[in-house]
Each structure stands twice: as C-alpha cells, then as structure tokens.
Amino acid sequence: MIDFHTHSNASDGALSPSELVDLATKKGLKYIALTDHNNVDGLHAAAKAAEQCGINFINGVEVSCERNTHIIGLFLKRFDEINNKAIIRREYIEQSLKNYGYTREKYETLIGARDAFIKMMIDTGKGTDKTFVIEHFLQPPFGYGEAIDMIHRSGGLAILAHPNRTKGIDSNNLQEFIHELKQYGIDGIEVYQSGQTDEYTDFVADLAQRNDLLASGGSDYHSPSKINRELGMYGDIDNRKPIPIDILDKLLQNKDRYL
C-alpha cells in the first residue's frame, strides 16, 4: 500500500508526524509522503520515524494556489525556499492578527491551520465569510506558475491535487484546466483520491494518459475522525480501494527530474 497525500499536526492534521508514520506502518503501507499545507516543518520528524519503522518516506508539501487549487510537491530535496515562504506567510498573519487585537498566545496555535483559522475568525465575528478572512488576514494564494516553479526549484514533482475539489473545475473543463497548468510545467495529477466515484477515477486516469502526466494517488488523510479519508485508500466511503501500487514505478523513475 502507498499514500502520497497526507497531513500531520504541522498543518491541519490531528496526528504528529511520527504518529502518522506509525499508523501507516500498522496499516501496512510501504511508501508514504507527508504533504502538509504550505510548510515542511514535519518532514524531519516523519523521515526519522519512517527510518525506525522501515517504511519508505517521501518529502512533500501541499501548496495553496489561486482558485482554491492545491498543488502537491513530491520528492522534495531542498527546503529553504518553502521555509522562507512559510516564514513570510506566518509573519503576515501575525501582523494582521495583531492589528485585530490578538496576542501571540492566541494566534500561535492557529498559524498553519488555515481552514480552522478561517472558521474561528468567522465564528468570532472578525470576518463575514471565507473570502473576507482570506483578503484581510491571509496572504493571497500562490499563482500556479509560482507554486510549480517553487516545487521544481526544491527538487520536487508538481502534482495537481484532488481536481474534483477545485473551485469552478468539473468534468467539462478539467481538460482545459490541465492544458493551462501544463503551460506552467505541471508534472502529474492525483488520479486516485478520496471521495470520488470509479467513473471519475477512470475519467481522470484517461486525462492523465492523454496529457502525458504522471498519475499519483493520496487519501488526503487528516484525522482518525474523518472516516471518509483512510490512509492508503481512495474512492467513495462505501467503495474504498487501496491506492494502486502500479503508479509507484513511474513516480520513482521521475523523482530526480529536477535535481
């Protein structure tokens, strides 16, 4: 079993990086990538735990982009640029929160958990809706080219995550969107994802093949409480299957595409 899209409490996951790796080991995974949102803080601990558990570990990240698009970076080899971007992002959020009367103690636990932060700001009346919170408290998301270039400079492959959850994108215009991303150098697409039908999986697999894109797969695991996202699995909650291990060879063959 494999999983190339997971989260720890270094962003909005519930488990620590080492706990995540331990769970993956117990479930029989052979490869796991940690892809926290916009930061690589948990990679060292996860890699160390993976070495101790005897599981293959892949350095990753999930970059938040415009139009609610997310791009996964896999096989990262350098972390400086992503770290620097994360520091700038945190400083921006910190200053914004100070402007609204929040102390360090209050916002320290929020930075990095983007969705939880947005919900908190709405619930406490500091923001009217998600768009308001993003525009007033958070930096604008990365542009597609900016995110892909950053991943490539970090030595990684750039993979479009869960296209079925990208704002404004559906089966009718996904091909057009892929064409746009290919102009920026996208390397692959997440074919196998949680919460999608077999028909949609087949549709995305066909698009990947026709567009010469690498096929990836990930559960988008966050927490044991999110029962619709199980480590190493994809598909609808009532029709889950292991992420096919046959996608592994091509990904490994291309892991050093950007040295």
Q: Model regions: which residues?
A:
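Extended substrate/RNA-proximal surfaces in nucleic-acid metabolism proteins
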Residues: 48-182, 239-258
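Conserved, well-ordered active-site substructure
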Residues: 229-242
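An N-terminally biased module of ancient metal coordination in phosphate/nucleic-acid-related enzymes
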Residues: 1-67, 137, 142-226
